[in-house]
């Protein structure tokens, strides 16, 4: 299974490609919030370097927030546009759950992100094992 993951929720844009649970490609670009200009070339480069096309992608995973409203819209719109022609499945990924997934120990996990204007996005006791089938969405 080929999974193309896109993250545009923050200042850096990220693209990754997983093939059968193996990371083939990963890149982050700190372009100063210019995701609208950099995301599609990042995806194009990823696919070319991995020898794949959009037709080879089985699932698109996209950061669905919390994060920059404009950044999230750019990522979601790009993935929706790529998925639509072939009705490829798309899966929303929570920023906070993705952070919690890096925790390998036991116990409570507290994730927090700067929401600007002296506010914080946070979640406690987040458990994230694997993307479940019912969490996937059609374009």
Show which residues each predicted segment covers.
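Acidic-residue sensor for enzyme active/binding pockets
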Residues: 7, 26, 135
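N-terminal amphipathic/basic leader segments beginning at the initiator methionine
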Residues: 3-14
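Single conserved hydrophobic/aromatic residue that forms the stacking wall/gate
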Residues: 130-139
């Amino acid at each position: 299974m080929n999974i193309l993951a896109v993250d545009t929720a923050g200042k850096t844009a990220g693209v990754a490609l997983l093939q059968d649970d193996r990371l083939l490609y990963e890149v982050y670009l700190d372009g100063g919030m210019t995701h609208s200009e950099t995301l599609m070339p990042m995806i194009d480069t990823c696919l070319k370097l991995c020898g794949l096309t959009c037709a080879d992608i089985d699932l698109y995973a996209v950061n669905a927030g919390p994060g920059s409203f404009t950044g999230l819209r750019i990522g979601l719109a790009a993935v929706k546009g790529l998925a639509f022609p072939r009705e490829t499945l798309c899966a929303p990924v929570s920023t906070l759950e993705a952070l919690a997934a890096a925790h390998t120990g036991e116990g409570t996990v507290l994730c927090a992100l700067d929401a600007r204007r002296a506010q914080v996005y946070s979640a406690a006791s987040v458990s994230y094992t694997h993307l479940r089938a019912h969490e996937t969405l059609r374009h």
